Amino acid sequence: GYARQKQFAMSLCSNEWVLNLDGDEVLNPAIIASFKRIIEINEADSVRFLRNDIFIGKAPSNFAKKPNNLRLYKKSKSTFNNSHLVHESAIVDGKEVFINESFDHFGYGSVSVITDKCNQYSSLKSTEKFLKNKRYSTLKLFLVFPLTFIKTYFFQRNFFSGNRGLINSIAASYYAFTK
C-alpha cells in the first residue's frame, strides 16, 4: 500500500523535516514562508494545515469547511501504519501545530475523475477492512450515504460551492457507501 511506500521514501530523506505532497498538490509562497518560520523556531514536531480541493477548475467557497492535513513532520518522530492501504497519514510522536494556510490539490478535474478515485479508494479500503476481519453492518449500509451527504453538504458547508459542492457531497457519500 501507499503507507509502505511513504515509509520507505521517508527513510531515504536526508533532512530531519519531511514534506509529504502528492504530484497533484501545489504549495503557495505564504505556506512556504510559514514552514520556514516553524522550522527555524523548532518548537513543533509536525504541522497540520488546510487543503483546497480544486474541483472542476475551481477552489471551494471560502465559506466551505476545508479538510486539514498533517503533511510536514520530523522524520525522527514519525512513522506510518503499514496496514493502511489508502488515506495513510504520518503518526507523529510529538507536538503538533496548526497553521491557517492552505495548499491546492488538483486531483479532481472532472466528475469522471472523482468517480474513478472513489472506486479505486473504496476498493482499497474494503480490502483493508477485509484483511482486518471487519464485518459490514446492514444498518450502516442503509444510513451511511444519507448521513455522509448531510455531513458534507450541510455541516461542512459544501452548499456554498453551488453545483460543485452538491456533486462533491454526492461523491463523498458514494465513497462512504462503497467502502
Indicate where each model-derived feature is located.
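Short aromatic/hydrophobic "clamp" motif used to bind/position activated sugar donors
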Residues: 18
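Active-site-proximal cofactor/substrate-binding loop regions of enzyme domains
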Residues: 15
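Catalytic-site signature of metal-activated, phosphate-bearing donor transferases
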Residues: 4, 10, 28-179
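Alpha/beta-hydrolase active-site loop signature
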Residues: 1, 25
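Active-site acidic Asp-centered loop
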Residues: 21-23, 30
